[in-house]
UniProtKB/Swiss-Prot annotation:
Top-level taxon of origin: Bacteria
Binding site for Mg(2+): 9, 63
Role according to the record: Transfers the 4'-phosphopantetheine moiety from coenzyme A to a Ser of acyl-carrier-protein.
Protein's UniProt name: Holo-[acyl-carrier-protein] synthase
Cofactor dependency: Mg(2+)
Keywords: Cytoplasm, Fatty acid biosynthesis, Fatty acid metabolism, Lipid biosynthesis, Lipid metabolism, Magnesium, Metal-binding, Transferase
Main location: cytoplasm
Molecular function GO labels: holo-[acyl-carrier-protein] synthase activity; magnesium ion binding
GO biological processes: fatty acid biosynthetic process
Subcellular location: Cytoplasm
Gene from which the chain derives: acpS
InterPro entries: 4-PPantetheinyl_Trfase_dom (IPR008278), 4-PPantetheinyl_Trfase_dom_sf (IPR037143), ACPS (IPR002582), Ppantetheine-prot_Trfase_dom (IPR004568)
Family per record: Belongs to the P-Pant transferase superfamily. AcpS family.
Length: 146
C-alpha cells in the first residue's frame, strides 16, 4: 500500500451546535448518512452534549477525508456519501456509498480514520491508501547555461 493522501480537520463544537440550532436539526440530516443519523439521534436522546460531539466528529471526519482524497467537498465526495461508523471495539472506520464508492474503487483507495473530541473541539485525521502503483515520475530536466 502507498499513501494516496492525508487529511486533518479541527472543528469548534459550539459552532456545530449553533448551526444545528439555527437549522432546526436539518444540518444533521444534510451531513450525516443514514447509519450515522441513527447513532446521532440515539446519543442525543441520552445526552445533548454527546449527540452534538458525535455530529462534530463526523463532520470533521468528512472534511478530513475530502482533503485526504484531494477533492475537497466536490463530486463525487458528498456529505452523505461517506459515513464514519465504529467497530464493536470503538475503532472508527469509513464506509463510502454510491458514486464515491465507485470512484474510490477505481483508484484502489481505502482509508483509515481517527476522531476525537474534548469539550470545545473535535478533530479527525485520515490516511488514504492505494494499492494502485503511481505513474512513473517524469525524468528530471537538465538545464545548462551557455
Amino acid at each position: 500500500m502507498a499513501i494516496y493522501g492525508i487529511g486533518t480537520d479541527v472543528v469548534q463544537i459550539s459552532r456545530i451546535a449553533a448551526v444545528l440550532e439555527r437549522t432546526g436539526g436539518r444540518f444533521a440530516e444534510k451531513v450525516l448518512g443514514p447509519d450515522e443519523l441513527r447513532v446521532f439521534h440515539a446519543r442525543r436522546a441520552r445526552s445533548e452534549a454527546r449527540g452534538i460531539a458525535f455530529l462534530a466528529t463526523r463532520f470533521s471526519a468528512k472534511e478530513a477525508f475530502s482533503k485526504a482524497i484531494g477533492l475537497g467537498m466536490h463530486w463525487p465526495m458528498t456529505w452523505r456519501a461517506l459515513q464514519t461508523l465504529n467497530q464493536r471495539s470503538g475503532e472508527p472506520y469509513v464506509v463510502a456509498s454510491g458514486e464515491l464508492a465507485d470512484w474510490l474503487a477505481a483508484r484502489g483507495i481505502t482509508a483509515r480514520v481517527t476522531v476525537s473530541d474534548e469539550r470545545d473541539y473535535a478533530v479527525s485525521f485520515v490516511v488514504a491508501e492505494t494499492d494502485v502503483a503511481p505513474p512513473p515520475a517524469p525524468a528530471p530536466v537538465s538545464r545548462t547555461t551557455p
